[in-house]
């Protein structure tokens, strides 16, 4: 009976440690800045790991009033590039927590 209580207490401590580590990793990921680029850096965007855009840079030569569609495409390419990097890093960082848990 005493042994079972010790195992449960040990398991709870391990879960608390795991939860603390997950939060730390998530906080670090959220604070990381990811850049997305399009067409030789004609458009560069910056996002934090929690998907908040912090900056966008558009080179003057990418701005053509007669071709707004091109600029829109470049912005989309840069944003999608950044999102892809965030997703990849999130999977690498947080995936370790769900690999050995059934059902996740």
From Swiss-Prot:
Residues 1-24 are annotated as: Disordered. Pfam families: YbaB_DNA_bd (PF02575). GO terms for cellular component: bacterial nucleoid; cytosol. It comes from the Bacteria. The keyword Secreted does not apply. Belongs to the YbaB/EbfC family. Binds to DNA and alters its conformation. May be involved in regulation of gene expression, nucleoid organization and DNA protection. This is Nucleoid-associated protein LSL_1227. The lineage of its organism: Bacteria, Bacillati, Bacillota, Bacilli, Lactobacillales.
